[in-house]
Amino acid sequence: KRRHKKAATLADLIAVVCHNRAVKSLHVPASFPIGLAMQLHERGLALVPQPEPFAQKRLTKTKSESNEIARVQAINDKAMEAAYQLLRESDIHHKDQTLFVGSQPLTAELVRQTIDLVLLKENCLGLNTIVACGPKSADPHERGSGTLYAGQPIIVDIFPSCRQSGFFADMTRTFCKGKAPDRLRRLYDVVAKGHAIGLKAVRAGVS
């Protein structure tokens, strides 16, 4: 639009596209933003909310799709193994419990770099991989940064996508170098019990 006129909004763009195609109603997810819904309604479009999942075809996977997901997850396994080996081979500086690799402190950035290299060699991208230590590990989706320490939880969460197929994998593991504190051991036991309960409930057709 010209500078003296109001800039086009997302609702304007959607309305124009629908008008050009003689579309008068749209099926939208039940969680569709109410503000945008009202704007589209004002522009003459009827919205029909649909139950989740919105894309029903995503409920099932073909054999080839399942195989591709398994392949990407196998690559993810390799990346997690590389992170594990780096932590395993690190040394503990007993004065302050800092982890070292050679003469350098082991950092979240170095672990993430190691993970990324494995993924890139397999044509996968690991965006926003999490390597979070200590208090940072308690903040969901905190990427983590800086030096890693012994005796503290180290969360590693890798969720790469294949650059060719677009399929994702996801894996999270909690590591602790050296002796784990009792509080962390108790937390592990609780999570392990919950995990076992979840596995027993998993079967085809369960919502």
Residue ranges and their predicted role:
Residues K1-S207:
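Active-site neighborhoods and metal-handling regions in enzymes and metal-associated proteins
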